[in-house]
Amino acid sequence: VRLVGSEMCIRDRYKGYYKNKNLPTKTIINENGLLLNVDVENGQKTGYFLDQKSNRYLLRKIAHGKRVVDCFSHTGGFALNAAMGNAKHVVSVDVSKTALDQGYQNAKLNHLEDKIEFVQADVFDYLDELKENEFDIIVLDPPAFTKSRRTVQKAYNGYKRINKQAMKVLKNGGYLISCSCSRFMETANFEKMLREAASEAGVILKQVSVTQQNADHPILWTMEETSYLKFYIFQII
């Protein structure tokens, strides 16, 4: 918008991103030393969930020698960081074959394909089939289970189910990484769910780290919707 005297000139407004046949929409980014293929046009969000960058690095720091499963892995962000941190074995689980295929290409790009097993499965079913003590670290980073206040209780039940499943099969002393990216699942409610899941699973949660989104996704106190990501690392005792 540009004011000229008493008249207002308005340029045509474009919706979405400007698409040019000569503009590539696939690129490779570097995240803490990991090379990652990103499909800006067809991928979820901007092709990669940049808001979890610093949180994925936290996993890398505790992964050495551990058996790790990355649930709802998308293109393998957490799984790749676990492998980069010299985990003993890593499993990347997602229902989307397309996401898993891209995750495998990311693993190849970093010469980590021999360290990660890619499994196409429904995470709820996969967790049901796990044996106790099979993994040292379980990452739960699901898509938003609720995108409105009307479905919060349904989302609460879904979060509780997967967290309880994970708590029951993790080895004693193992780590649970639990996330929610829904702003409608408020922090107090999410923590209440975690306490209930732990009680029903018969475990105690020892808090290791609590964070939110990466700094390049700023939280504005005048806009409550900007505070949406909840990230917890617990040790199971």
Label the predicted regions:
Residues V1-I10:
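Single conserved hydrophobic/aromatic residue that forms the stacking wall/gate
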Residues R13-N86:
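Glycine-rich adenosyl-nucleotide cofactor-binding module
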Residues T98-V139:
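S-adenosyl-L-methionine
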Residues L112, L170-N172:
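Helix-to-beta-strand junctions that scaffold the AdoMet/dcAdoMet cofactor pocket
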Residues E134, R161, Y175-I237:
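C-terminal catalytic and target-recognition region of SAM-dependent MTase-like enzymes
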Residues D136-Q165:
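Mobile active-site "lid"/loop adjacent to the S-adenosyl-L-methionine
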